[in-house]
Curated annotation (Swiss-Prot):
Key component of the proton channel; it plays a direct role in the translocation of protons across the membrane. The keyword Cell membrane applies. The keyword Transmembrane helix applies. F-type ATPases have 2 components, CF(1) - the catalytic core - and CF(0) - the membrane proton channel. CF(1) has five subunits: alpha(3), beta(3), gamma(1), delta(1), epsilon(1). CF(0) has three main subunits: a(1), b(2) and c(9-12). The alpha and beta chains form an alternating ring which encloses part of the gamma chain. CF(1) is attached to CF(0) by a central stalk formed by the gamma and epsilon chains, while a peripheral stalk is formed by the delta and b chains. Keywords: ATP synthesis, Cell membrane, CF(0), Hydrogen ion transport, Ion transport, Membrane, Transmembrane, Transmembrane helix, Transport. This is ATP synthase subunit a. GO terms for molecular function: proton-transporting ATP synthase activity, rotational mechanism. Its main location: membrane. Belongs to the ATPase A chain family. It comes from the Bacteria. The gene is atpB. It is a multi-pass membrane protein. One of its GO terms (cellular component) is proton-transporting ATP synthase complex. It is found in: Cell membrane.
Length: 241
């Protein structure tokens, strides 16, 4: 794997299952680490809120901090109207965060490095926001395609541009997340492979450098979950404001 840094993103079958309606539904390493990420996410939340103490322990404090953090993102971008959509946005944030952090572990698989996963997640958000927009604002929601004060002769061009920009939102969301996760993991793998091949891994400087890179990748994992969430809230603001 050190010689091929992209091998870590390869999907392979763990348990082969019969095809369903012509589609391969075998249990893969991607399926396994998605399941692990979801289980860890659920355990984190369940054990964090289990006691509900007035004076929280470390785990409860962590859950409350994450929850308050997501609340602040929603309020800053959508106002109080966006708070009713906490379940979706919080779930999106904690799921992406869990998948990203699991992907940092050695010999794991980064689920969010595959566009098919991030695009599916982006489409769920996109469809949800579109439904909310028409439900909350009805036909008024279409005004996002034509800013106020636009000259009538320019309106057709602006509408086409705005419509295209709206439709590519899930594409940009998915590619941004996947590309950043691929880039970060590839850089770490290339540098780590070089250090191992040079037989200098256990000398202080390279070892500390690898630790620093892993720490940076953890930061990127958290940052990408934050960026995906804040963009979701920005798009949601068009639907509720």
């Amino acid at each position: 794997m050190a010689l091929n840094p992209l091998e870590q993103f390869k999907v392979y079958t763990i348990i082969e299952l019969p095809r369903l309606f012509g589609y391969d539904v075998s249990f893969t390493n991607s399926s396994f680490f998605t399941m692990i990420s979801v289980i860890l996410m659920i355990l984190f939340l369940l054990f964090g809120i289990k006691k509900g103490s007035v004076i929280p322990g470390y785990l409860q404090a962590a859950v409350e901090y994450v929850y308050d953090f997501v609340i602040s993102i929603i309020e800053n971008n959508t106002g109080s109207k966006g708070l009713q959509h906490i379940p979706l946005i919080f779930t999106v944030f904690i799921f992406i965060l869990s998948c990203n952090l699991v992907g940092v572990l050695p010999y794991s698989f980064t689920v969010t490095s595959h566009v098919i996963v991030t695009f599916a997640l982006s489409m769920v958000v996109f469809i949800y926001i579109t439904i909310v927009g028409f439900k909350e604002r009805e036909v008024e929601f279409l005004r996002i395609l034509l800013p106020k004060g636009t000259p009538s002769w320019l309106a057709p061009i602006i509408i086409i541009i705005k419509l295209f920009a709206y439709l590519v939102r899930p594409v940009s969301l998915s590619i941004r997340l996947a590309a950043n996760m691929i880039a970060g993991h590839t850089i770490i793998k290339v540098i780590a492979g070089f250090i191992v091949n040079m037989n200098i891994f256990f000398t202080p400087a390279p070892f500390l450098f690898i630790i620093a890179l892993i720490g940076f990748e953890v930061f990127v994992a958290i940052l990408q979950a934050y960026i995906f969430t804040i963009l979701t809230c920005v798009y949601l603001s068009d639907a509720v404001k």
